[in-house]
UniProtKB/Swiss-Prot annotation:
Gene3D superfamilies: 1.20.1250.10. This is Interferon tau-4. It comes from Ovis aries. The keyword Protein transport does not apply. Paracrine hormone primarily responsible for maternal recognition of pregnancy. Interacts with endometrial receptors, probably type I interferon receptors, and blocks estrogen receptor expression, preventing the estrogen-induced increase in oxytocin receptor expression in the endometrium. This results in the suppression of the pulsatile endometrial release of the luteolytic hormone prostaglandin F2-alpha, hindering the regression of the corpus luteum (luteolysis) and therefore a return to ovarian cyclicity.
């Protein structure tokens, strides 16, 4: 039994490795992780959003860029990656640890990291030499500005409970948009090495 389990694990690792045949396909696992992260964010709710209405802010989520036809396939992958990386960075901070139930926060950060790890399998193959120029690509810059606005807001509000609640709701929107982008990539073929 242990041998069969070891063999199955080895097959999975080979299949998802850099040279593996499944390496650059968006998997169901990525979508399941995305859904689980949304559920965790929902469970992290500590305050009624209605009690924080005075702290609401429009962060300018670039939703139309992601959900519309503005992104080409070669832009969609780096935008998805950047959204997940910035989400992870937002929640993997000392300020965030003080604001949330640490068990749920750890689970969320782990889930975001799993999504990033899955995408890392493809990142070098998809982006390769283009990586430095993609960092300056308009959609990436837009995503970075969006998250910088969130960081600035939290700092301006002194990382208050209401500020974090507003950001939690906003991040649910952002991760929903990133899930939509994952679905679009899958419809584009899912094979991130194809043109």
């Amino acid at each position: 039994m242990a041998f069969v389990l070891s063999l199955l694990m080895a097959l999975v690792l080979v299949s998802y490795g850099p040279g593996g045949s499944l390496g650059c396909y968006l998997s169901q696992r990525l979508m399941l992780d995305a859904r689980e992260n949304l559920k965790l964010l929902d469970r992290m709710n500590r305050l009624s959003p209605h009690s924080c209405l005075q702290d609401r802010k429009d962060f300018g989520l670039p939703q139309e860029m992601v959900e519309g036809d503005q992104l080409q396939k070669d832009q969609a992958f780096p935008v998805l990656y950047e959204m997940l990386q910035q989400s992870f960075n937002l929640f993997y901070t000392e300020h965030s640890s003080a604001a949330w139930d640490t068990t749920l926060l750890d689970q969320l950060c782990t889930g975001l990291q799993q999504q990033l790890d899955h995408l890392d399998t493809c990142r070098d193959q998809v982006m390769g030499e283009k990586d430095s120029e993609l960092g300056n690509m308009d959609p990436i810059v837009t995503v970075k500005k969006y998250f910088q606005g969130i960081h600035d807001y939290l700092q301006e509000k002194g990382y208050s409970d209401c500020a974090w609640e507003i950001v939690r709701v906003e991040m649910m929107r952002a991760l929903t948009v990133s899930t939509t982008l994952q679905k679009r990539l899958t419809k584009m073929g899912g094979d991130l090495n194809s043109p």
